[in-house]
Amino acid sequence: MALQGWRFFGVSATIIIYIGGVLFLSMNNIPGSHPKRPRIERFAEFPSFHSPRFPMPSRKMTIRWCRDLKYMNRDLPNYTDYRADFYTLPSDVSASLQASPMLTALASFPGSGNTWLRYLLQQATGILTGSIYKDYGLLKTGFPAENVCNSSVLLVKTHEWGGKSWAPFAKAILLVRDPEKAIIAEFNRQSGGHIGFASPDRYKRTKGKYWQQFVSNKLKGWELMNLSWARNFTGSIKVVFYDDLVHHTERELRAILEFLQFPVDETLLRCAILRKEGIFRRKKRLLSFDPYTEAMRAQVQARKRIVYSLLGRKEH
């Protein structure tokens, strides 16, 4: 009997100790029952680190305009009035384009500096430029007249060619760039946006076949785009070469404004020249390899010589 009593006592004590331990642990895990340990953050100064050389990804790009932008006939509403959901893309772009004796196209192959020229003209005139497209990136960073295709804007951006493409326009500025550079610029845009870059790995996808096909397709498009507008557009046309715009910016802007029959404001023009780099001209980046093979470069240069000759451009 005494042995059984001790066994009963031992089992009871074990159960009591177990229950007590469970209760103790439960009380310690109740939220707020004990102070929270401070979180030690390594390199805690980094979240507040900002440098103009290394902008944070979420940092909003801002443009200093020489003058508040407006439409040709009315002041521009506040930028905050523009919301992406206010815009609807027409099912037929040509239906939104109305032929006008005042409508001027800014035609170019993608990667030829169209956005940069629009930026320069907005700086030099204070007038908005439009587009047949609705690029939300541009819409939010200095081009609120994206998808405006009427004479309320200075000119209208297009990368299209063919009868329907030029029918609404009375005049056109054709911006032409060296195809070798334009194709790389377009490759960068498709991979990294208007001011970004394609990673080196992108050129080597599928053992380089993707890049080779890209060059072949875009070279044909470059030739068709430029010759189609230069030969078949029946309105007044002015050909502007990107290299001239880079090296003789003021001279070219004056000539463009004269073609547009828009009076030159000397103060605005000086301001535009001072701020000509802006944020829409992609900075140069040297690759550690040449993306063009000898055969590709020979093909590109051959087509360039033909097109430039037909456009009246003499290459030295």
From Swiss-Prot:
Stretches assigned to coiled coil: none
Transmembrane segments: 8-28
Keywords: Glycoprotein, Membrane, Transmembrane, Transmembrane helix
Gene Ontology cellular component list: membrane
Chief location of this protein within or outside the cell: membrane
Keyword match Glycoprotein: yes
Localization per Swiss-Prot or TrEMBL: Membrane
Membrane topology of the entry: Single-pass membrane protein
One Pfam family here: Sulfotransfer_3
Glycosylation sites: N78, N150, N226, N232
Protein family (similarity comment): Belongs to the WSCD family.
Name used for this protein in its record: WSCD family member GA21586
Native organism: Drosophila pseudoobscura pseudoobscura
